[in-house]
Amino acid sequence: NAEGQLKGYVRSTLLRHFADSNQALFLGSANKSDLLLGFGTPEGEFEGDLQHLGDLYKTEVLEMGHFIGLPEAVLEKTPSRCRTPRATDEDELGAPWAQVDDILIQLQNQVDPQSMIDKGMDALTVHRTMRMLQDNQGHFQKIPVLPTGRNNKSIEKAREAEASSLA
């Protein structure tokens, strides 16, 4: 909705102005889940010189918040982009972030979607998440993300393949 997008634009414009006025870096707050699914706009939620949370899934950001001792009131707040009154991320996604992140992580690790469904994941949630991922493929690749340096199965498989080809 237009009013919701305007809120994101105004917020990011004010933050950009503050950062520029103070010769500071504007750190964005987009996480990997948001970026993969296009759950934001480049001029709004995805604005920033660097997305320092951009390599962490939404659920990992919450785990980090618990670890560093953020107030429970902040951590337990229902995720919402505040685009429309009382609308939550779960309403827009059709599932809680924990389920969506589980699907994204398994897809990153090249798990077959049908095997996820066969193991009990909701088929609609798996397919909806895949559609959102495919719809946004490549749209936000130019957004600078601070990598965490963690390994995933894709990287491990590539390293194993490289090692075996050298042998």
Identify the residue ranges that each predicted region occupies.
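ATP/NTP-dependent adenylation/nucleotidyl-transfer catalytic domains that generate, transfer
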Residues: 1-167
